[in-house]
């Protein structure tokens, strides 16, 4: 600072106040001001005295001690004023630029630039903190509804939703998130769309009526939209924002936590065209689709109403932990969850990570180290046979246990050429089997044909081992089998007969190999064709069971005929010996 003030201090103009710093030459003054002698000798030139004054006798210098009592300009100005606002102005100027002169245009532009750059820096690296601070400052009683409308539209970018916030938007700085308290979310064609602040009581009453009155969703004046509709109440939603993701077109949401979700999911108005393809309903990617880095959900209970007069049932989720949740890969991310557990129509289901350690008892044929296990216990079979062709569509009674293992290749598989070759061969064999199933003639697939192993990337394929256990099932011969060939139609009656004769317990094991691209834009088990592939694998398993059962029956007949022939020969030989 002395470099900037030197031209002003050496000016011949005399100032009415003491200079910036006065270093005394007198030992008495140095001891009074507690100034070290070394420092005093180095900067004596900053004194406001003239040369004759410095050479004056000591008695004249002692008279000026009272005028040199204050070290800085700020101290002198603070003593000269009694107004608290003037003192505040002096302190602010001194704190910002270590000077008491008025602000000029350069100072103001520097301050504005500093404020803008610092706020941009905070917004980029601490987006949630910046937004929560803005919300805290403008979240007054009059601005709450306007703020809820703008924030809701910016976060969801969905004009078809009606969202009501009963409580204010509260920034939670302890967890670094923004909290929405008591939220009501609705999607109905006759409900006003928008984001408002209001009461949650209407949503609670609608949810309670839906749980007790089955005819609620069938009322003529309730809804008639051809899409999934819902009325949901949420106790608390915590979100964190990420500016960098928003710039990259991945949505501004970074982490989302949902607690206490209740409501109704109504699909009674959903209709499909005849021979409609589920692939027509895949999500079309758009820049800005959310890609949540971490999704957590706890304490969920919903009532689900299915189309075609299917009975309503409840779906509950105790806790859900997803490492990522992307709108364009929704179903695939759910299958790769860290942990999901709950009930589906009073049937327990779990999705969790399963790891195998490298121990000496590990099966060498197991080529995959990491997997995600999906398990459903004691599920009613009518959830699988609704509108499905194949063996599941023929079964109209019974229960099923399902276990599915989503397999991921080992990280060390790339270094082991033999293991990688086995993985690629497995994928190639499954693809050939799938091609034979859906193609009537395949001339390239013959005894000497082998898949191009080098052209297959294991990371591009989705592998799932399915294990199904059917209990107390009952099947009927379908009236129309337009989706099956003549040869496959000939096996319908044997398969139905086998199911009814072994209805107590039927185990089915199969492996499904699909490309990961089949799950792009998929939200359900149907539009990803996973249900179709599962039904086809179950058909192949039943066909193998029927063939094995026929071979076993033929073998028993031959053994019985041979035993009867042997007994007759022994009897004839005995009669000959007696005669």
Swiss-Prot record:
This is Mitochondrial distribution and morphology protein 31. Belongs to the MDM31/MDM32 family. The gene is MDM31. Keywords: Membrane, Mitochondrion, Mitochondrion inner membrane, Transit peptide, Transmembrane, Transmembrane helix. The keyword Membrane applies. One of its GO terms (biological process) is regulation of cardiolipin metabolic process. It holds the Pfam family MDM31_MDM32. Residues 136-558 are mitochondrial intermembrane. Residues 1-47 form a transit peptide. It comes from the Eukaryota. Present with 1200 molecules/cell in log phase SD medium. The chain crosses the membrane at residues 115-135, 559-578. It is a multi-pass membrane protein.
